[in-house]
């Protein structure tokens, strides 16, 4: 057994330590790249467990990498040296406090953007920046570590622009609070309480410490919503339109798809429609033999989308 794995196995519950070969292979890669193999995946459930893990790794000189929902495609949580320990934060996903009077919410770093949004929706509030397209799985800690953009970015900027405070376990295993939360008996309502230490731990991919909690501001949910889409033959006019709309603060989100991505999305939509049609036709046939014959006939005819349609730039 690896020396650091032996050490942490004596300090932490066995159920949060994973050395299964398949899990090691999975967690040693992100959506795009494969990194050096890690030696263990640890899924802490409390701040104390995170601190114990960090101290054990410090004693052994073992690198630590931190992972949220695993949606990174930029090597954000990949190890840079073999036999590192990966900390999977998704077990720490509690919504700690919602303060409607002072307009903030405190969450554990492993909470997904979708979970937070759905929890706040009945209260009529949301965070100004409220996650990525992958927010069903992507975590708040991961979004802050990679300084993600998407929902709300049209008016409120990036994830890092919308943080009041973070609670961080440092490289020595100490717990550090930033912003007004660093003061005893003070609420985490203000980021700029002295030097902006909060900013140190945003966009760092977890390199400067393990974020265990974050406090985000709250704003009212809009009373009405509207959506529109535009097609462009070239990227230049689309980008200029996006820039002008952003300058006028006319939308909370604006994003575009290039021809390649748009074509992939159209293929997926076409395949989904074909599958639905296949299911409907087959269900109408009587007898298993007829079902097989009709299904094979449709399958052999190929998908309705063959890439012949000209695809341009699309702005939503």
Language model features: what each stretch is:
Residues 239-316:
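C-terminal substrate-recognition/cap domain of FAD-linked oxidoreductases
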